Amino acid sequence: AGGADNFMRF
């Protein structure tokens, strides 16, 4: 999940 990982990075 690209979107989910990007959110977790923030």
UniProtKB/Swiss-Prot annotation:
Principal localisation: secreted
Domain of life: Eukaryota
Family, as annotated: Belongs to the FARP (FMRFamide related peptide) family.
Post-translational modification Phenylalanine amide, affected residues: F10
Annotated protein name in UniProt: FMRFamide-8
GO biological process: neuropeptide signaling pathway
Keywords tagged on the record: Amidation, Neuropeptide, Secreted
GO cellular component: extracellular region
Signal peptide start-end: none
Compartment list: Secreted
Taxonomic placement: Eukaryota, Metazoa, Ecdysozoa, Arthropoda, Hexapoda
